[in-house]
Amino acid sequence: MLFRSQAKAVSNYTNSILANMEATDEGYDEALLLDSQGFVSEGAGENVFVVKDGVIYTPDLSAGALNGITRNTVFHIAKDLGLEIVQKRITRDEIYIADELFFTGTAAEVTPIRELDRVEIGSGSRGPITEKIQNAFFDIVNGRNPKYAHWLTAV
């Protein structure tokens, strides 16, 4: 049974929990989920972004990806940095030949992905675009970017 992941709800995490259990049983840190047609959807609890030839790609929402807050934050960051983001259907093969790959999410924040299915992604380390996105993200969430101060609530 497939669950649509357009909202964070307990039932929607069932596939994610099962996928993550299977991934960790096989020695991986995280799972990458595909939609019912075999296109990349998201991680078990994160959105996924692919960098190829300087362009950032992410699955469009029709693939079942969650329209997450951190995902949308990355869209703002990319615009600020003059980087192009394209939402499209992404094949598993496109993941393997990516220059860079990263997850985003509330817990993941911006996390580089070094390999998938034991296939090294790009250089096997955090790439320059992922680094720019990650640094800008941490500047925002740590209050070092005044443009986004209105996003923060002091507690």
Residue ranges and their predicted role:
Residues M1-V155:
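Helix-start/capping segments and mature chain N-termini
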